[in-house]
From Swiss-Prot:
A GO molecular function held by the record: phosphatidylglycerol-prolipoprotein diacylglyceryl transferase activity
Membrane topology: Multi-pass membrane protein
Gene that this sequence comes from: lgt
Pathway: Protein modification; lipoprotein biosynthesis (diacylglyceryl transfer)
Matches recorded under NCBIfam families: lgt
A Pfam family annotated for this UniProt entry: LGT
Coiled-coil stretches noted in the UniProt entry, renumbered to this chain: none
Protein EC: 2.5.1.145
Keywords: Cell inner membrane, Cell membrane, Membrane, Transferase, Transmembrane, Transmembrane helix
UniProt source species: Beijerinckia indica subsp. indica (strain ATCC 9039 / DSM 1715 / NCIMB 8712)
Name of the protein this chain belongs to: Phosphatidylglycerol--prolipoprotein diacylglyceryl transferase
InterPro entries: Lgt
A GO BP entry: lipoprotein biosynthetic process
Physiological role: Catalyzes the transfer of the diacylglyceryl group from phosphatidylglycerol to the sulfhydryl group of the N-terminal cysteine of a prolipoprotein, the first step in the formation of mature lipoproteins.
Amino acid sequence: MPLMLVYPAIDPVLVWLGPLPIRWYALAYIAGLLLGWAYARRLAAQPVLWGRRTPPSALEVDDLLVYAAMGVIIGGRLGYVVFYNADFYLEHPLESLSLWKGGMSFHGGLIGTALTIGLLAWRRSIPLAVLTDLAAAAVPIGLCLGRIANFIKPELWGRVADPDFVPFAMVFPGAGSLPRHPSQLYEAFFEGIVLFVILFIAIRLGALRRPGLVTGLFALGYGLARIGCEFFREPDAQLGFLFGGATMGMLLSLPLVLIGLFLVIRAASPKLETA
C-alpha cells in the first residue's frame, strides 16, 4: 500500500469563549490584516524606499487598514455570492449574510479592496498608486494565513492524487476516501510566501520608486500562481469545470495577469522613474 500523509485533523475552533467559537478561519483574517498593517507601516516609515514619492503617513496607513478590511469582507462575500454560487443565493438571499458559514472569494475581496482604497485616495487626496503599491506589498501575508486556514477547516482541497507520485497526498474529511493534493498548502506557499519574497526583493531594489510597479508585480505574480495551483485544486462542486478544463479561479485570474503585465510594462517607462 503506498505511503501518504495523514491529515492532521486540527479542530477548526481554536477555543470556545462560552457559547462563542473562536475559529482559526476568523483569526487568519484578523492576523492577516494586522500583520499586513504592521508591515505597511514599516514600509511607509522608510522614505528612502520611495524616492521622490511621498509615502503615506502613519495615520493614513491606519485608515488604509480600515478601508481594506471593509473591502475584503464585503467584496469577498459578494464575490463568492456572484462568482461561485449565484443560483443558490438568488433563491436564498438572506443566506448571503451568513458569513460564519464560510464562502469568500479572493477576487471579490480584491475588487472590493480596490474600490475602498480608491475611495480613501479620493477622500485624502493621496495618489492612488501610493496606496495600492503599499497594500499590494502586504497582501501575500494575509493570503498565506488564509490558505493555511482553508487547510485547517478543511475546505478547497485538491484533486485526487496518486500517492505513488505525490507522497504528501492525504485524505481530507468530507472529500471521500481517495488521497488528494493539499492544494491549500501549495497556494499558501506560492501565493503567500513566494510572492511576498518576490515583492520584498523588488522593493529593496527600488520598486516603490516607480508608481504602480509593486501593484503590477503582485497582480501578475498572484494571477500566475493561482492559475498554476488551480491545476491541482478541486473545482467548486456547484461549478465544476467550465470549458476546456478551465475553472472559475483560472478565468478570474487571467485578467489579473494581463492587468499586472500592463502595469509592470508601464512602470518600467523611464518617464516614471522617481529616484
